[in-house]
Amino acid sequence: MSDLRFRCLVDNDFCDIAPFEPYIEKGSSDMGLALIAFDESELDTIKSLLNETQLEGSDGYLYILSQGSVEKKGKMPHSVMKAYRYYKRYKKKQNRAAAHIERELSHSGDGIRKVSGGRFSAYKYTDQENKICFPFRLRASKNKNEPLFILLHGAGAMGSDNLKQLFDNLPLYKQLIKTDCNILLPQAPFGSNRGEAMQNYIKSIKRLVDELPADFDRKRIYIIGTSFGGCCAWQLIYLFPEYFAAAVPVMGGLCLDRDYEKYDIGRLVKTPIWAAHSSDDTNVRIDSDDYCAAELEKLGADIKCTRWDKYGHTMSGKFYRTENWTEWCLSKKLK
């Protein structure tokens, strides 16, 4: 029994009680349900946080955690065992990504390295200060002093192939292609959608923009983010007020832990924001956007909200196709 591990899914109420620690692993997309996995030696830590809970054992049986003890039940369905295999693959992929970053940091200096040319030129960026490296694509305008659009992808496009983020942002190109502008598409390393790794990635995006090999208008930098990218967009304008001319976070959120009092919402006042979300989104809940919008309206900020009640965590495509977010962004400029 010493190798027996348990798995269960919990929602954000659990995350409010216990921040992510080594024994709590996140396997779902973005910030909705959290996948936690732990072994018997960690039960004392877990049982104080959960009441009666159904656990899935690595031996193929269901267990019930009740009043501090675990009771073995019947066999698990095949779908649950499949989820276990997914979890193992997830961890291996995460470990490989961490090892890749470590190798890159040890062999590369700070800054930008061009990999290939073309319409969307491929680059690699190494940030020794924040201990991260990642690829990005840049479509530079032929003209000087044009605006810069930063497109931040969802969690599904994380990796190091420098391709997934292109496909993830396809609905946005169809709008931006009509505009003479610079387009930056960073690709977040696998596993950088939480904790310190996420903060390092966010800070590195700002450093990358400062060092970009493109002559663009620094008073017209616009940040567009989808899902995980929407969360990053909120964080960027919170950490660096008066740097971005406007932000469009879609299906994202700033206060995902719902500890609203620790956030100084006034930091967002000087950045025009168009937040888009769906009330039936179960991956990234709308609570944070609702809270930030209400507080920013009280402060007289330039805040616009698109709040739908259907489409769930798939509303971004329709939003980008049907709303005039491009024109709205271009109407904003830093003073």
Residue ranges and their predicted role:
Residues 219-266:
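Primarily recognizes the serine-hydrolase "nucleophile elbow" in alpha/beta-hydrolase
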Residues 148, 152-203:
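Active-site machinery of serine-nucleophile hydrolases
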Residues 193-227:
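Gly/Ser-rich "nucleophile elbow"/oxyanion-hole loop immediately N-terminal to the catalytic nucleophile
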Residues 276, 282-335:
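C-terminal catalytic histidine-bearing segment of alpha/beta-hydrolase fold enzymes
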Residues 179, 268-273:
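Short, proline-enriched alpha-helix->beta-strand connector loops that line the catalytic pocket
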Residues 78-148, 181, 236, 292:
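A domain-start/cap signature at the N-terminus of enzymes
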Residues 2-11:
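Short glycine-/aliphatic-rich beta-strand segments at the starts of folded cytosolic domains
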